[in-house]
């Protein structure tokens, strides 16, 4: 939520962010969009405003992080929005339970934070198998730690249904040829 706080320092008008998302979606009609929001941001905007925005503009997939409890998540699911939950590599039981009770894909941390490995599930494939054994049949996408082609291969071999690549690509936004080359390099491993 630090990034959103910084963004709100620059512009505190949520409507401008929402207008930007709508414009981006209109300019890219063949692209699937997944929103990411912190629960506290939804509360700041007002739950009803956020739900109405998502439904009116067909933003039906949401990664929801920073949950205080299941209230907002459950309201979003009831409204027809697919809510995906983030599960840390060490398989925090509260996060696993939240993912089980959700209706979107699972966003699983691809690589552990130093010192935060569940000794019963030390490898990514073990984490994925554990989530499957708990009854999760929806896609499991891995992110946070996917930087190089070998990271994509590792996630694929572990049984991930897909990956998220963040900063590696975002850092190249001013160098389109390098950006395109990096995306191709990563996609070649899929």
Language-model features, listed with the residues they occupy:
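Glycine/Thr-rich beta-alpha phosphate-binding loop at enzyme active sites
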Residues: 95-132, 172-174
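Alpha-helix-loop-beta-strand connector modules within alpha/beta enzyme cores
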Residues: 1-34, 75-91, 121-142, 146-148, ...
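Active-site beta-loop-alpha junctions enriched in small/polar residues
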Residues: 36-41, 67, 86-88, 111-113, ...
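N-terminal active-site wall of soluble small-molecule enzyme domains
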Residues: 17-55, 67-75
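Glycine-rich phosphate-binding active-site loops on the catalytic face of alpha/beta enzymes
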Residues: 57-71, 107-116, 156-179
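Short, structured coil segments at secondary-structure junctions
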Residues: 57-58, 79-80, 101-102, 136, ...
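Catalytic cores of alpha/beta
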Residues: 48, 91-101, 134, 142, ...
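Generic hydrophobic/aromatic pocket-lining and core-packing "Φ" positions
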Residues: 21, 51, 73, 96, ...
């Amino acid at each position: 939520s630090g990034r959103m706080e910084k963004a709100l320092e620059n512009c505190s008008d949520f409507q401008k962010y929402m207008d930007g998302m709508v414009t981006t979606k209109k300019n890219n009609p063949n692209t699937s969009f997944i929103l990411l929001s912190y629960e506290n941001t939804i509360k700041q905007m007002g739950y009803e405003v956020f739900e109405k925005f998502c439904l009116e503009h067909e933003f039906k997939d949401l990664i929801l992080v920073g949950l205080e409890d299941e209230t907002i998540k459950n309201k979003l699911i009831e409204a027809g929005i697919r809510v995906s939950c983030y599960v840390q590599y060490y398989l925090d039981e509260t996060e696993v339970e939240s993912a089980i009770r959700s209706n979107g894909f699972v966003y699983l941390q691809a690589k552990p934070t130093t010192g935060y490995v569940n000794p019963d599930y030390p490898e990514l494939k073990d984490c994925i198998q554990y989530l499957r054994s708990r009854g999760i049949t929806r896609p499991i996408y891995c992110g946070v730690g996917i930087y190089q082609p070998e990271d994509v291969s590792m996630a694929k071999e572990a049984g991930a249904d897909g990956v998220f690549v963040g900063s590696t690509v975002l850092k190249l936004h001013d160098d389109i040829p390098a950006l395109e080359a990096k995306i191709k390099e990563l996609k070649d491993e899929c």
